[in-house]
Amino acid sequence: MAKKVVAQVRLQLEAGKATPAPPVGPALGQRGVNLMEFCKKFNAATADKAGMIIPVIITVYEDRSFTFITKTPPASFLLKKAAKLNSGSQEPKRKMVGKVTRDQIKEIAEIKMKDLNANDIEAAMKIIEGTAKSMGIEVVD
C-alpha cells in the first residue's frame, strides 16, 4: 500500500548549499523531517548546478520520510544571468534595464522546456520573452 502524503513543501534553494537554517529548517522541521538527511541528499543532487537557484518540491509522508523533485532554475534567474543583472526593472514597461538576444532566449527556452507548458521551442521562446519584458529586459535580434 502506498504511503500517505502529509504535506508538499515548495522551496527555492541555492544548488549545493542547503542548510538546516531558514528557509529549510522551519519548513521541514515542523513536519518532522530529518533536516540533515534532506540537506545531504539535495546538495548531492544539485552539486553540478552550483550558483543556481533550484526550485524543489518536497513530498513528506506520514512516517516522516520524504521524496523531492528538483526543477529547472526560474526563467527570471536565467534571464538576469544572461543579461548580467542583479535585479529586474522597478518600472518594467517604462524603463529597460538590460538586453538579451534571441539566441540567449532560445538557450533559456531549451533549458526550461521540460517545466514549461509549451509544445515546441517557439512557444517556449515566447513564454521566456514575455518574462523578459515583464522584468524590463529588452529582447534584441
Swiss-Prot record:
PROSITE patterns: RIBOSOMAL_L11. It holds the Pfam family Ribosomal_L11_N. SMART domains: RL11. Keywords: Methylation, Ribonucleoprotein, Ribosomal protein, RNA-binding, rRNA-binding. GO terms for biological process: translation. It comes from the Bacteria. GO terms for cellular component: cytosolic large ribosomal subunit. GO terms for molecular function: large ribosomal subunit rRNA binding; structural constituent of ribosome. The keyword Metal-binding does not apply. One or more lysine residues are methylated. Belongs to the universal ribosomal protein uL11 family. Forms part of the ribosomal stalk which helps the ribosome interact with GTP-bound translation factors. Part of the ribosomal stalk of the 50S ribosomal subunit. Interacts with L10 and the large rRNA to form the base of the stalk. L10 forms an elongated spine to which L12 dimers bind in a sequential fashion forming a multimeric L10(L12)X complex. NCBIfam families: L11_bact. This is Large ribosomal subunit protein uL11. The lineage of its organism: Bacteria, Thermotogati, Thermotogota, Thermotogae, Thermotogales. The gene is rplK.
